[in-house]
Amino acid sequence: MSQHELDIASSPGDVRPWIRYISSVKNDKTTARQKCILFERAVTALPRSYKLWKEYLDFRSGLCTGLNPIKHADEYDRVNALYEKSLVLLHKMPVIWLQYLQFLMLQPKVTKTRSVINEALRSLPVQQHPRVLKLALQFGTKVGGPTSVQIWKRYVLAYPDQKETMAQSLIKMGYHGEAAVVLIELLNASGDNYALWTELVDLIGESDKLTLEPPVEQIISSGIKRFPDQRGPLTVQLANFLVRNGDLESARDVFEDGITTANTVRDFTVVFDAYAEFEERIVTHLIENESPMADLRIAKLDHLLERRPFLISDVRLRREPYSVLEWQKRIALYEDPAETVAAYTEAVQSIPPAKADGKLSQLWISWAKFYAEDRETACEIYHKATLVPYKSVSELADVYLAWSQYESENDHWENAVKIIKQALESPNTHVSYHNSDLTAQDRIHKSVRLWSYYADLVESYGTFEETKQVYEKIMALDLLTPLFVVNYATLLEENDHFEEMFKVYEKGISLFEESAFEIWNLYLVKASPRLGLERLRDLFEDAISKFPTQKALYILYGKLEEDRGLVRNAMRVYSAMCDHVKTSETFKYYIGRTVENFGLAATRPVYDKALESLPNKDASELALDYAQMEEKLGEIDRARAIYGYGSQFSDPQIIKYYDAWHKFEVAHGTEDTFKDMLRIKRSIQAQFNTDIHYATTAAEVKKGTVQEFVKGETVQKGNIEPPVAQANEDEIELDI
């Protein structure tokens, strides 16, 4: 008897001798049958030993590796029986169950495997169920069919977060009804998950017959409420489901509801296009089958297409019910006069004036213009329009202006004037135009636009006195504007009321600082032929004191003095102009007037003053003119001196100045004077280059782009430029 047998005999209840015995025969030449006999003795002796059974089951399962489960079914069945025997006493061991299930999944025994899964779930504690269910799910995925559905249902009880995966798996297997139920459960739990809704709706759309609780119609209707921005696509899905189920009338009802309740043009377009396509398919089918209903369906399709612009208008009006523009677009769709009138009536009744988006007055005006040929009705509409409490006075003014213009165009100018006059009459003249607490009707008499139109109207159809009274009323209401000032002054001038005209100009100057200069200009032009010199001088001095830099005032003042024969006074005015407005243009004007009145020689003081006062660029230009003037007078030395003096203002890059000087020396100079010119030009060139260099360096330093100091040793030989020979500044090369 071997030592192992002796150990077992001496310790019959101890598992360790059996383990040692089994381990010793694993790799020796003992046959599989002998090993099996040993395992049988061991598990018979110790039937509750997990280790012995695990070793035995691993050994027997391993013997089946590579064997065809159909050809060697008997061998597999013996191992199955062995697993069953082990589980009699070891039914609480999850590893044995899992190993058994894995072994069964190798065999074509679907019913047996399902039975073992159920037994495992019944035997093991709940905490171990997920392990079994994961393996069961692999089995269900492999075999598919109702088995997979049932396993999935049990699996998601343990793993509820896997319901979406379950739905995907069921869809792949073709169990649309079960998948839809799972998706509905997910939606009820998760709320507004649009991805799940899309998946559910697509699933419904792909299924011809689908019975759900709640019904499909209720499900999609719920989706429309939850996702209003997807109303169009969801409506189309519902209609298509009904079409596939043969319920065409219900599908039409869904389409009709979709196009009449859509809140966006996008949703409307989606539903309408699907609706039209649906009707076209029906018409095509009826025509192909020569159905007598074809003509009726064609007529209904045509009517649907004709309704499209009106339905789109409905959509826009549902979104913007108070939009004046959208109502105008709606009205423009109608061709029948009765329908147009009904649309206008609906529009003005639907838009509360306080909430109007846009000018409500334009709607009333266009309605009145619709009745342009029926004066009585048009005026009635205009009258009603004046009673509407608009948001702004401007809108009410638009109505009165349109009404008055309508009457004027129809040669009823008395009514045209009367309409505006009545609008501008108010017992309370002290209200503020901008007081929004008052109605537009209470403030309309402060409308500048209406008063302006009224003044033009009275001036065209009334008398001078009536027009004057209008302007006086405007002034009394503190509604005067610069334009009113000009218009009123022009009216007074045309009727020879000059003193009153001057008073109007003076009032305008005192009221409007921003426009005072323009009013002064008009005032002085109009006053010059009509007032005495002393009074005019006072006016000009007053204007110039307020606008000392306005060149036009000096020119106008100087012209007055010249026209009155007081040329020297005019020159003093022009001199003052150049003191306050230092530009080349003012000096040139002064020079021009001096030449005309006193000759060329008299301009020397003016030129001198210009060269002292003007910036370099302008001084250079005037210096050139000055030198050429002296040349004309034969003053060659003076001209040369001026050229030299003006060179300090003139950059040599300005070719015009030095070219003129060059020609002058060629014509009148000597070799010495020419050399002097070149020396001066070179000196000025150096001066300008130095100025440019310093300006550039300063700019680079400010920007931080100047290169830092570099040691001499670091300069590479190839970067050293040859030295420049020192030039003699006094050496001049002549190129004559």
Curated annotation (Swiss-Prot):
Q: Name one GO cellular component term.
A: U2-type catalytic step 2 spliceosome
List the InterPro entries hit by this protein, alphabetically.
HAT, HAT_Syf1-like_N, HAT_Syf1_central, HAT_Syf1_CNRKL1_C, Syf1-like, TPR-like_helical_dom_sf
SMART domains given in the database record: HAT (SM00386)
What are the alphabetically sorted keywords of the record?
Answer: mRNA processing, mRNA splicing, Nucleus, Repeat, Spliceosome
**Places the protein is found:** Nucleus
- Swiss-Prot/TrEMBL GO biological process terms: generation of catalytic spliceosome for first transesterification step; mRNA splicing, via spliceosome
Q: Where are the HAT repeats?
A: 1-27, 30-62, 74-106, 130-161, 246-281, 339-373, 377-409, 428-460, 462-494, 496-529, 531-563, 598-632, 634-667
Its chief place of residence is nucleus
Query: Which SUPFAM superfamilies does the annotation name?
Result: TPR-like
Q: What does this protein do?
A: Involved in pre-mRNA splicing and cell cycle progression.
Q: How does it assemble?
A: Associated with the spliceosome.
Give the family, as the similarity comment puts it: Belongs to the crooked-neck family.
Report what the protein is called.
Pre-mRNA-splicing factor SYF1
| Organism field | Yarrowia lipolytica (strain CLIB 122 / E 150) (Yeast)
User: What is the taxonomic lineage of the source species?
Assistant: Eukaryota, Fungi, Dikarya, Ascomycota, Saccharomycotina
